[in-house]
């Protein structure tokens, strides 16, 4: 059994959720570190949902962040304002990696990210006109924000799945019931102006080392 202890200050801890993880316009001043940003070809899946993906390519050594980037990361923000025939959009984050030292860790992706997006239409017989805006942080020695905007039309006749998006979907974190994680327990204890979170879990060997990520919401 491995244990992780973490203090969370009360101002940030109104709710706690634990997650175990075994056309684009770009301002010229933002181009440093960013090699390319596009939307992957979209398609209509058998369940009536559309899939597309944000494809981000960074310069060598540059990183971008996961949905919960850690204390020192830059939280991403993705919005769909102005889209038509769109009932729901779900961003499906692939499993990330952990960067940095023991005292300053961040969570994200190195040099390339394909970020799948599942879109539920209001009327499945009509196309979706997608308007997507994204605010992301990219980092080498220092971190800088980038602002992206895309337009894409997804038509019911588009039914050929994009292989890059499918590959990214295969790397999404799995629910606990589908993992080999055993004997998971979590305790929250008040401690002065913070909450002490203690987590214990039997983590199967994945190779060199295993990382436990706590996501706060």
Features from the language model and the residues they span:
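Extracellular/lumen-exposed scaffold segments
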Residues: 29-217
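N-terminal secretory signal peptides that target proteins for export/translocation
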Residues: 1-12
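Generic hydrophobic alpha-helical membrane-segment signal
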Residues: 3, 18, 48-49
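Generic detector of short alpha-helix boundary/capping microenvironments
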Residues: 7, 17-19, 105, 131
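Bacterial N-terminal signal peptides
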Residues: 13-25
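Intrinsic low-complexity/disordered segments
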Residues: 6, 27-29
